[in-house]
Every structure is written in C-alpha cells, then in structure tokens.
Amino acid sequence: MVVFLSSFSRVAQKFSCLFSLFAALGFTVAVNYSYAQDISPSTDQDATVTYPATYFAEFDPYSVSDMLDRIPGINVARGGGQGGGGGGPGSSGGSNRRGLGAGGDQVLINGRRIAGKENEGNDQLSRISASQVEYIEIIRGTSGDLDVRGGSQVINIVLLESESSSSIAYELNVDRTWDSAYNPGAKVSLTGQRGAVDYFLSGEREPRYELNQSREDSVLPDGSPNDRIQRETKQDAQPLTLVGNFGYEFSERDLAHLNLQWSEDNQDRELDRIIADDKFENPVLSLQFEELPRDSESWEFGGDYEHEFLNGSRFKTLFIVNEKDDLFTRERYDVDNLDRSKNLFISSSERTRERIVRTSYTFDVFDTQSLEVGVERAQTLLDTSLQLGLLTGGEVSDRFGGLTPVTDANGMVEEMRYEYFAVHNWQLSNRMSMESTLLFEDSTIKQSGDISQSRDFDFVRPKIDYRFDITPSLQFRTTIEKDVAQLSFGDFTTSAQTNRGSDDDQNQLEGNPDLVQEQSWRYEANLEYRLPNDSGVINTNLFYHELEDVIGKVDVSTVEDVLSANGNIGDAERYGLKIDSSLRLGFLGQPNMLLTTGLNLEDSEITDPFTGMKRRLSRRGRGNLSIGLRHDIPSRNMNWGFNVNDGFDGANINYDIDKTEEYGGSYSYFSWVEMVGWGGLTYRFEARDNNIRCRTRIRFENRTIGDGGLRELEKSCFTTGAVLALKVRGTF
C-alpha cells in the first residue's frame, strides 16, 4: 500500500494540470455537441449499451465489423479494453500473453468467449455476416457472469436464433502496388444454425505483395563520406487461413464449442543491393543479391464446455492445443556481371507448441457477490535451430549452403506453468462495482541443447477493478494490477535476424539463457462520458506503470567481438495520458458524420546499462495523434472516410551496445469510398499511404567503455509505395 500511495502521488504531481485541462475541455465539448439522433441505442441501469440490428439497417452493413464502425467510441472497446497504458513492458496482454488468462480480446459471441489465442472473437468480426446479428452490447460494467474480465469494455455480439438458418458472405479483392503489380485475394464465410448446432466456417487468401525501396547514406566521424547503399526488396506471398467454429447445446444448461484454425504463409523474398564506397576519389561500386524465403505453417484447436447448475452456479473448462513451424533462409551473393558468388548462408527454424487447459467454478456468495475459483495449466515448448555459414576458405558443408560452418546452434525450451486464481465480484450498489483478483503462478523453465538448465519461478498477482457510474452516461473506473509478461523463448537461444530494417552488419542475434520475466505494477484511472442520444463518447485515461526487470540489450561481449543480447536491465517507470473522442457532427446538420480523434502522451525513464545515464525505454516514443472521419450517406447507399495517424518525433530510439537507432514518427493514412451498386453488391475502393519510414543509426566502438567512440553515422529511408485496392462484397 505504501508503494501504491507513493507511486500515485508521483502520478498526481506529473499530470494534475493536464488532467484538469483535458477534463474541462472534454465536458465543454460534450455540452456543445450533444445533439439528438432519430434512432438511439438503449442504456441499461448497469451501464450496458445495446444496439439492435435495426440501428444499423439504413447503413446496409456487410459484416459485424462494419456495424461496429458506426458506433461512437468503439475504438476504445476494440482496443482490447487496455486503456491508455495497455501493452508495453511488463504486460501479459495480446496473443503472446501467458496462457489463456481471464482476459482475451474482450469480444464475446453470444455471451461466450472463443477458446483460442490466434482465433479469438475479434478475429471473427470481419467474417460474420451482419444479417446474422440480433443486437450488439457494449458492456461497461463488471459481472461474475462475463466470460472475460479485466477490460474497460466488453463487446458482446448476439446472433439470431432459429431452427435452421444460414448466410454466406464473400469478398473478392485486388491490390495495385506502385510498380503496377495486381494481386488478387478472396474471402468466403458461412454462418448458420441447424437445431442445437451453430457453426461458422471461413476461408481467406489475402495478397501480401510488397516492393520496398530504400537508400542509406553513411559518413565517418570526421564528416567525410563513407558509403551509399540502395536496396530493393520484393516480397510475394498469399497466406491462406481456414477457420471453423462449432457449438452444440446439449440442453438449456449444457453447452460445448470447438474451434479450429489452420494457416499457411509461404513468402518469396529477394533483395538487390548496390553499394557505393565513397572513401575513394572515384566511388567503388559493388552489387549483392539475396534470397530470403520464409515458410510458416500453424494450426490451433480449442474448445470449451459449460454447465449451469440449478442454483445458477457455473462450471467451465477451456482448452487449446496449437503449433507453429517457421523456417527462414538467407543466402547472400556477390554479383559480378552474370556471375554470383555466395558469401553468406543462414538457416533458422523454430517450432512453437502450446497445450493449455483452464477450469473454473463460479457461484454466488450473496445476492450481490459472486466468486470464481479455478486453475490453469499451460505447457509451452520451443525448438530452435540455427546454421550460419560464411565464405572463409575453410572446409565447406552442404548443410551450411556449401560454405564454411561458423555457427551450429540448437536449443529446446519448455515452460510448465500452473496458475491458481480467485475472482471476487461485488456489486456495491446499483451504481458501483468492485472486482478483485488474486492469482498465484508457479512455473518451471527447462532448457536443453547447447545450454542445459532448469529454473523455478513463482508470482503473486493481485488486481482491483473499481467502477462508479456517476450517471448512466458518465463512468469512472480505476484499476491497480500486478502483471507478469510472457518471455520470448526465442531470446534464450542464438537466432537470425528476420525483420525488415535489420542490420546488414549483424548476421545473428545472441541468446541469453538467464532471462527472467518483466513485472509491473500498473495504476490506471479512466473517465468516460457518453453524450446524450448517442451523439458521441469522450474517454480520458491516466496511467502510471512501475516496471521491474525490464528487458533490453546487455553486454555479452567476448575477447574477440563486441556482442549484446536481450537481458534484464533494471527497473523503470512509464506514465502517460490518453484522450479519445468520437463525436457525431449533428451540430453541423450531419448526424451521420462521425469524427474520431485520439491523443496519446507518454514518457518513461530507465538507467542505460551501458552509459549509466537516464533515458527513455527503447522504442516507446512520446505518443501519437490520430484523427478519423466517417460519413454515411444512406440516401445514396454509400459511405466514405479516412484515418490519419502520426507519432511524435524525437524519442523513438532503440539502444544497443554498439549503436543507437532513432526512428521518425510513423505517419500513416488510410481512406476509402464504399457504395452499394449493381447486383446489390458492395463496392469498396481503398487507398493506403506509401509507408515512408526513416532511421538514423549511430555506430560506436563499444558503449560500455566511456562514450565508446563514434564510428559511423547512417541515415536511411525506405518506402513500400502507395497501395490501391478494390473490394467487391456480397451475401446470400
């Protein structure tokens, strides 16, 4: 409690002025913009907002996702309910979260959570036909009856019930990239019910073609030119995803669901590189070519069973089994006219498996209190293999691409984790609720291969979630939570760089078998105001995080080489303010215009392990600003809009032992025009930005020794060009 009070005091000092300013601004806007609508959703006493299907009828939506886009403030709910400080260091959220947990993505289908991590409720929103929806709920309160917990809001999609019904939705699309390449794709889904069985099937193959061009200019410490590098990368892929969800109602008190997903993503990627060495009076040109194919295949099988007892208590079991296989190969050649000479070979494979089962029992303690108790068992396994071959003149091997073996690393990591939890929900009054969680976690991580060891961990993770409905439209929420992040087991072993923008001078990433989990105490306060008559929503979130064992780069240098690896670099703090607004422009006579804005301000502080100086967390930045507009024109069966997002420059820096990399603001835009036309089909035209990104990389000799000595300054920018897309959608 002492830690909490001191932390909250620091937050108050940092943000009291900003909070007052924005709160005043929000209420001023709310008063001025509250204009009535002809059709309004209903708001229950428990602050649940219900949108019947008739609310969306005039917009002729194609999918559930289209319906949600018309709801003011839906961006807050679709953010996973994490608030302004969601994610980041020390967080266990997202598809990489620890096990199943009680959260998920805060989307329910017919009041039930889909048992999956890669195949959750949010993934189904663009696949389910709007014609199958009876109503949509935005649940702003807490309840022991909810299948997910912990989010600021929960979206519940309730589908129509009938003895026999089905609906097919399909989409044909084509992307045009800036090199005039046309890449087709398609989606199809079937949603239906037959007696006690409900089902959902879908398949999609999406274009993922990309042409990336970049230029890099490098200078030496004295300002003289070093070299210039031009790169052109082509990537061609069409990932295929198949999904099936089935439900069976044995009786009014017994339900079961099965969920399946399989996906395949085989990428063909090639890179051409032109290097101009400017250290000579006449620049020396050299050419390189790389082949970088990547093949991925994954599947997931999950399910749940629920039984409701006569006294209203519930027993529920969920399980998930999944696997992902990933193979990345990199072969680099020096090019001389038509001759190619291979000088680098990398083969990196990973196989990840999870086996999770979660069981809980929920019952009423008193009329206004409920308790859920349960246990979760999760096994996670990772098998890795890395082969690195170089042209050194030594003995060669076919397994290393016909080059000399340099690295042959193999490893296996297994985590066996047990989680025991109790969740108490207390409706203090018809306007106040408090949900408290106590979770104990016990795990063992074993490693074998190049390094063999076993380590045990245990954590106690409490959480308090308090909500006060000041009015049905105005809600205050505050949470205090201890969180533990999932480790990336790939950091334990030596691996290859596979991401775009990786360092040409670094062939592999070192592993660190001594990593421990990031932990955090997370404090958040949230104020949400829903304007009368569905005119809009204003949401303000203030957060402060105390971080322990933050993961960053640490020194693992040898006598011969300066090396770093991901490791725990100490404690840190992160704090910020997020304001979201979603307003209908009824005051301009345009009630079907929805203006959405977002302002995210954040800062952080940690001690750099190499220099001992205070700095921000790697790649966290200072926040971003977003604005979007959607205009529905029902009389013409059309809508149009745009979304723009820009990050603040000057603080998005990645820190390493021998370099720093500063990234510019991530500006992006997206616009569309959509209309219902010939054949009753929906035609949608989209335009996406050219994705220009810039980076300044400063190389040092070794930052652990004084200032390390400046070695090189690199400035680079890349673009993937604008993308135009045409989509044709229909249902029957």
Residue ranges and their predicted role:
Residues 543-546, 565-650:
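Gram-negative outer-membrane beta-barrel transporters
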Residues 178-213, 224-271, 292-312, 464:
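Transmembrane beta-barrel wall of Gram-negative outer-membrane proteins
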Residues 112-140, 188:
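Short acidic/polar hinge/loop motifs at secondary-structure boundaries
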